[in-house]
A protein has these predicted regions:
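Tight coil/turn sites that cap or link beta-strands
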Residues: 46-47
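Short, His- and charge-rich active-site/binding loops that engage polyanionic ligands
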Residues: 1-40, 85
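Residues that flank catalytic or metal-binding motifs in active/ligand-binding sites
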Residues: 39, 59, 69, 88, ...
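C-terminal accessory segment of soluble enzyme catalytic cores
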Residues: 93-161
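Extended alpha-helical targeting/anchoring segments
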Residues: 28-38, 50-76
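Short acidic/glycine-rich loop or secondary-structure boundary segments that cap or lie
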Residues: 50-54, 82-84, 101-102, 158
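A motif-centric signal for short, conserved binding hotspots located
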Residues: 5, 64-96
Length: 161
């Protein structure tokens, strides 16, 4: 959920923007204010999910560290007031992954390949405190040797009783 004017998006209140492209984050109306203020964040995760196309059909694949430890994803954040309540939002920053040996297997074959940015533990504080002019120093490619992926079908939802 990203904080934009109340007339945009879901229920005329907000807009879902899970990802922000590093190439355009400073220009997009949804993100440029937060970028200008260097409002950087980290999202801790154990696994992310991406579509992988097998025989023309999307399958849900989980991407996680080989050692099973959580990792942190570079993000940008902002806040706004909706119906009198403060709403905070974050979007993961992504980089091009067309030529990445691991991340290029995800998304539709004809689409541009994108990757999250994993911020290693030793750079977390630096990322959170950097200025927008320094941010590209942290646009690391996914470390291939540390990650793996497997098919993770969505759990079946139980029908209402």
């Amino acid at each position: 959920l990203w904080n934009k004017p109340l007339e945009i998006g879901l229920c005329n209140k907000a807009k879902y923007t899970y990802n922000a492209r590093t190439e355009t984050v400073d220009k997009k109306p949804s993100f440029r204010h937060a970028w200008a203020k260097s409002q950087f964040a980290l999202i801790p995760v154990e696994k992310i999910y991406e579509p992988r196309y097998v025989n023309g059909k999307a399958e849900r694949w989980g991407i996680y560290r080989e050692d099973g430890l959580p990792f942190t994803v570079a993000a940008i954040y902002d806040s706004t007031v909706i119906d009198g309540q403060q709403v905070r939002s974050m979007s993961m920053l992504t980089i091009n992954a067309d030529n990445h040996p691991f991340m290029s297997q995800f998304h539709k074959p004809e689409d541009e390949k994108r990757s999250i940015i994993v911020i290693p533990e030793e750079y977390r504080e630096d990322w959170l405190n950097c200025k927008k002019e320094e941010a590209d120093q942290f646009f690391f490619e996914m470390p291939v040797a540390e990650f793996k992926s497997n098919y993770f079908p969505k759990p079946n939802k139980k029908p209402p009783a």
